[in-house]
């Protein structure tokens, strides 16, 4: 007892971490020293608390549920093997201007387990570490732990609009979040897939748009069905959460020290709203735009009514308002929007969006709440008290933090859990990107060391996001979440993370425990990893040669620029990054490689990517041409195919073999009537 209390006081005075490997705990504790022996938990092992009240009642119930033990008020004599939870009345430790209410110590000896903290949240997290140290069902490995998180915000987002997930499923995920010390559940409740929240003032939201005509997202959304229906209609698919169910879920989360943050999308991503209330669009018609009309005052009356009920249900500090991917096209020609721009002295539709966001923020602030939104809320002007969720990359979040805004980092390249986590053609359908466990674990939210002190103050944490366009079932959702959510948990909690191999080993142990708890997951033991061809540079006659683009790549998918197709690096599974180049529209890809001199050719090959979830398809037409002077070309091979190959994902080459002489090698690739992207990595010449 005394040495653990001394360790607590020493940590308050000095926050310099010591790296000691944990046995099997995720996230890795700040300090953990393993020792020999075990504490054996028996059915009659008493648990003592030194505090009372509602928090004590909740703690007792949780201990009964997870450990099956009775809890008592008071202190047992030292000869009785017991588990002791002590709430300390001392000042919280602090660092970078933040206090750490989740700090705890855990001391396990063969005779006693002692958890101490100055908050019940810290005691709760000490219990999670205790649970993870258990082996053989009832033995807890002896250890001494001093622990606290790096960031106060460690979150998971679940999209329940594209596909509806039951309250029971959400509670199961809240249990897993608590086990891995995640403390923010971002609940994506509204979007084009359906409105999921009962709003008593506007009953049509659930009556008209909580259900849709089919569950297949590709057929319903991508093939432009997009019709909503009533719950009793034949084939109706969807659902919604009653206000009583929401209250129950919020309370369930709170007992696990998790804050639920609701997201109500605006001004974009609101197709479903207008099927119920078409007067809120610029044209006053349903199915014409995904955006609210900022020039229409009735829009703000509606949203304030919705948000009033949202705030009554969710006591969270933040209300997430989306703010991403607003189309804005209708605003450019809408008389009401143009009048609003004129009246408010705005420059363009970006500033009109900023006006919209700031007006909503003022309403939330007036009710004691803060606005949180995706990083597009920075377009035009950022609302003065808004917090930013940085998803398009890291720059927006860093910019907002340097300007004194609170930020949650969740860049898609590391934190989007709807993307493939292993070789795509071995995996269930996903959104097309590639975020394996190692990539998620490698994320460093504060990579700019020169301004680390400022960033530490305003970057609140990290979040893993599961969008569910391609995730229709609970089993699929868990498969996408785990184990990558464990990496997010450790990134958010542990300042000095161990090497990936260490984390991977601990994760495999954690997954074995999750299996016993009934979770589905991707089995790391079966992981195949990166594309083999991408690991070794390839040498060929066109390596480093100049490329002239007669039809250029898009800047968004530029690879490394003009040298991408001849840099000797073949693409990995992910279409983003610097290995692939993306082309769209018109002739799509038309590139000429200058070999520098007339050269004898025997083979030309280029890999093309198909990833249907993100509208990338193997080209309908590919042609290889050669020239001696760069003016007059001869076609060596042309491949014309209709888009009959409907596989979700593959990488295949277009290859010519033969004999020819040329200085210039030209490769053309384009799509037919169906359109879509062309992605190519390297044009190899031998």
Protein language model regions, located:
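Aromatic, loop-rich ligand-recognition surfaces of beta-strand-rich domains
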Residues: 572-637, 648-686
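Contiguous, structured surface segment used for ligand recognition
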Residues: 22-151, 476, 488, 492-522
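Flexible loop/turn segments at secondary-structure boundaries
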Residues: 55-56, 164-166, 192-198, 267-273, ...
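Predominantly extracellular/luminal regions of secreted and cell-surface proteins
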Residues: 536-570
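Feature activates predominantly on carbohydrate-active enzymes
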Residues: 24, 94-300, 304-318, 359, ...
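Bacterial Sec-dependent N-terminal signal peptides
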Residues: 1-24
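Active-site neighborhood of glycoside hydrolase catalytic domains
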Residues: 273, 279-283, 287-384, 391-398
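Flexible, acidic glycine-rich loops studded with aromatic residues
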Residues: 370-376, 381-386, 392-537
């Amino acid at each position: 007892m005394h040495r653990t209390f001394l360790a607590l006081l020493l940590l308050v005075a000095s926050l310099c971490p010591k790296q000691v490997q944990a046995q099997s705990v995720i996230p890795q504790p700040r300090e953990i020293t393993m020792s020999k022996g075990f504490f054996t938990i028996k059915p009659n092992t008493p648990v003592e608390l030194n505090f009372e009240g509602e928090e004590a009642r909740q703690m007792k119930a949780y201990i009964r549920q997870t450990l099956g033990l009775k809890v008592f008020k008071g202190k047992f004599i030292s000869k009785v093997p017991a588990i002791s939870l002590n709430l300390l009345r001392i000042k919280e430790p602090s660092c970078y201007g933040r206090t750490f209410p989740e700090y705890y110590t855990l001391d396990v000896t063969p005779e006693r387990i002692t958890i101490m903290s100055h908050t019940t949240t810290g005691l709760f997290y000490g219990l999670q570490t205790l649970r993870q140290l258990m082996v053989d069902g009832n033995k807890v490995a002896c250890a001494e732990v001093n622990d606290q998180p790096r960031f106060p915000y460690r979150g998971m987002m679940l999209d329940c609009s594209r596909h509806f997930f039951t309250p029971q499923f959400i509670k199961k995920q809240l249990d897993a979040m608590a086990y891995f010390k995640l403390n923010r559940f971002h609940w994506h409740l509204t979007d084009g897939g359906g409105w999921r929240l009962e709003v008593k003032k506007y009953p049509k939201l659930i009556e008209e748009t909580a259900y849709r005509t089919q569950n297949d997202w590709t057929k319903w959304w991508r093939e432009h069905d997009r019709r909503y229906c009533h719950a009793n209609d034949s084939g109706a698919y969807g659902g919604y959460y009653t206000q009583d169910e929401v209250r129950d879920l919020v309370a369930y989360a709170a007992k696990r020290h998790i804050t639920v943050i609701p997201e109500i999308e605006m001004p974009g991503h609101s197709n479903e709203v207008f099927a119920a209330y078409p007067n809120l669009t610029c044209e006053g018609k349903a199915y014409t735009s995904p955006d609210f009309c900022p020039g229409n005052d009735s829009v703000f009356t509606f949203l304030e009514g919705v948000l009033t009920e949202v705030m009554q249900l969710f006591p969270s500090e933040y209300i997430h308002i989306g703010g991403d991917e607003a189309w804005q096209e209708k605003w450019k020609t809408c008389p009401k929007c143009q009048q609003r721009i004129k009246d408010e002295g705005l420059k363009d539709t970006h500033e009109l969006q900023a006006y919209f966001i700031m007006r909503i923020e003022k309403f939330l602030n007036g009710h004691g709440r803060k606005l949180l939104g995706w990083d597009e809320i920075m377009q035009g002007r950022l609302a003065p008290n808004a917090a930013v969720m940085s998803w398009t990359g890291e720059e927006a979040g860093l910019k907002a933090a340097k300007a004194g805004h609170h930020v949650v980092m969740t860049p898609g390249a590391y934190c989007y859990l709807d993307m493939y986590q292993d070789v795509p053609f071995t995996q269930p359908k996903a959104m097309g990107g590639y975020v394996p466990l190692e990539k998620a674990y490698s994320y460093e939210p504060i990579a700019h060391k020169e301004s680390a002190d400022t960033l530490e103050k305003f970057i609140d944490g990290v979040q893993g996001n599961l969008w569910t366009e391609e995730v229709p079932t609970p089993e699929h959702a868990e498969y996408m979440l785990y184990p990558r959510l464990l990496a997010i948990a450790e990134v958010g909690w542990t300042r000095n993370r161990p090497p990936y191999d260490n984390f991977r080993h601990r994760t495999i142990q954690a997954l074995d425990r999750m299996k016993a708890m009934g979770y589905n997951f991707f089995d790391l033991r079966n992981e195949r990893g990166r594309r083999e061809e991408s690991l070794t540079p390839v040498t060929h006659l066109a390596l480093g040669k100049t490329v002239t683009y007669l039809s250029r790549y898009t800047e968004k998918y530029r690879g490394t620029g003009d040298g991408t197709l001849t840099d000797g690096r073949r693409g990995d599974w992910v279409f983003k990054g610097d290995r692939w180049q993306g082309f769209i529209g018109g002739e799509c890809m038309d590139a000429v490689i200058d070999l520098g001199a007339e050269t004898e050719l025997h083979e030309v090959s280029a890999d093309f990517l198909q990833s249907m979830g993100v509208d990338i398809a193997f080209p309908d037409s590919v042609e290889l041409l050669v020239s001696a002077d760069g003016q007059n070309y001869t076609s060596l091979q042309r491949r014309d195919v209709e888009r009959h190959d409907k596989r979700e994902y593959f990488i295949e080459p277009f290859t010519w073999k033969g004999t020819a002489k040329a200085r210039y090698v030209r490769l053309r690739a384009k799509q037919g009537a169906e359109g879509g992207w062309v992605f190519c990595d390297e044009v190899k010449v031998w």
